[in-house]
Amino acid sequence: SYIKDVYLIRDRLMAQDDVMIMQIKDYIEMPKENGYRSLHMVIRVPVYFMNKKQLVPVELQIRTLAMDLWASLEHDIKYKCLYQTETENFSEELKECSRLIYEAEEKMEIMNRTLEA
């Protein structure tokens, strides 16, 4: 998946007449301090019961495979650091990894656009 696909999914959800957008947080354009990137949306979707329909809030975290890989590995590293007495502070290294992954994604997306043209 490419970065543009994240926004395509967002746009398609926004076009749905039965989905209500409550909140959008774009951590791709504005990454979190630790380097985390993702598009978060809180939406209300219809859930059908026997006698009624109810709009239920749902949080979506939409990201590319590379963003998901970074988030999973970052979580694993932070979790392990909680239980070790002598650990290095990896925050700068994690941010750098996030930046490098994002740059690679951008390059891959440019190559894909060139091939699609």
Predicted regions and their residues:
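Eukaryotic low-complexity, non-globular regulatory regions
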Residues: 109-117
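Long beta-strand-rich cores associated with HINT superfamily self-processing modules
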Residues: 1-108
